[in-house]
Amino acid sequence: MKFSPLLDELIQSLRCLPGVGPKSAQRMAFQLLERDRKAGLKLAAALSSAMSDIGHCQSCRTYTEETLCPICASHKRGSSSTICVVETPADVLAIEAGGHFTGRYFVLLGHLSPLDGVGPEELGLALLERHLASGDVAELILATNPTVEGEATAHFIADMARRHKVLISRIAHGVPVGGELEYVDSTTLALSFNGRIPL
């Protein structure tokens, strides 16, 4: 069945979201139109505001509506000498949820991937190097994902940081708390054995 042009446009627009196929997009559109137009208008307004007003922090590159994000603008954390390098703003939220890290961040917005045309420039590494060259950074914690690209990115950044005599560390990888060994892949088990600590 062919829908009206506006309804078809709404369904197609919802399909841009990850994991949303044609049927899911259709259900979402019908839900908003049939049962919750007020929420649909609120969603449209929030989406419009976010798309026009949210940019990147000039210091760490996470999402913010201001020049600096709340962490970088904080007197205590913004002047921290420890920077944690992550791939995405979602990684910042995950680390913040743990409440254990009190330094500042640098968000790469991806990882090195020459085949996809993602090099050091696209990751903002010139800005990171300026932070390192300022002399205000004592430690760089590399928290890129444990993928081939994430590891390559971590090694590239570590080489860059060594030129500035900055302490470099990498977050640990291994068996998750509550995980069962029989379900853990061999690479993760190898990392767990190689990274074991004395008790």
Curated annotation (Swiss-Prot):
Q: Where is the Toprim domain?
A: 81-176
Top-level taxon of origin: Bacteria
**Chain ranges of zinc fingers (C4-type):** 57-72
InterPro entries noted in UniProt:
DNA_Rcmb_RecR, Rcmb_RecR, Rcmb_RecR_Znf, TOPRIM_dom, TOPRIM_RecR
PROSITE patterns (UniProt xref): TOPRIM
Tell me one GO molecular function of this protein.
Answer: DNA binding
Q: Mind listing the GO biological process terms from this record?
A: double-strand break repair; recombinational repair
User: Which keywords accompany this UniProt record?
Assistant: DNA damage, DNA recombination, DNA repair, Metal-binding, Zinc, Zinc-finger
Keyword DNA repair included in the entry's annotation: yes
The entry sums up its family as follows: Belongs to the RecR family.
UniProt function note: May play a role in DNA repair. It seems to be involved in an RecBC-independent recombinational process of DNA repair. It may act with RecF and RecO.
| PANTHER family associated with the record | RECOMBINATION PROTEIN RECR
Q: What is this protein called?
A: Recombination protein RecR
What is the source species? Answer: Shewanella oneidensis (strain ATCC 700550 / JCM 31522 / CIP 106686 / LMG 19005 / NCIMB 14063 / MR-1)
